[in-house]
């Protein structure tokens, strides 16, 4: 705790450095951060489904498992209410994500995660790059605050 206080600015600098790298990667993939927020909200809804339980912590299988976990989905109005983004804008962002094979809309107009084809390969690559960046962030912070004992 004292070590974190002594390195407070360093820790925040490393965190923001990671956050900017993470968001810039996704912004390049999905055009803007509002689209990313809409997509990540649908992903969070799927991963926080009470029926979604992971027995084996495996990054490669996680993305496939989370896609089949949400049998209901979210509607555009709910996404708008949660994010504060106007509904017409949410609808435009959803159309972009559906057209680019990130999301799926069912006959009840509910949106769920469904990453397919080339988009799946690109998002898996982004996920891997972001995990490396997260690991680097954790390594730098833990190394700086001397959490890991070298003895």
Model-flagged regions — what are they?
Residues 36, 88-89, 95:
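Key DNA-contact positions within bacterial/archaeal DNA-binding proteins
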Residues 58-61, 75, 102, 107-130:
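Short, cationic-aromatic polyanion-contact patches
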Residues 66, 71-81, 97:
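A short alpha-helical element within helix-turn-helix/winged-helix DNA-binding domains
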Residues 1-37:
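N-terminal leader segment of winged-helix/HTH proteins
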Residues 14-15, 20-22, 94, 100, ...:
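Long, amphipathic alpha-helical coupling/dimerization segments that relay conformational signals between
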Residues 37-72:
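Short helix->loop/beta-hairpin flanking segments within DNA-binding domains
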Residues 1, 119-150:
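Short, amphipathic alpha-helical interaction segments positioned at domain boundaries
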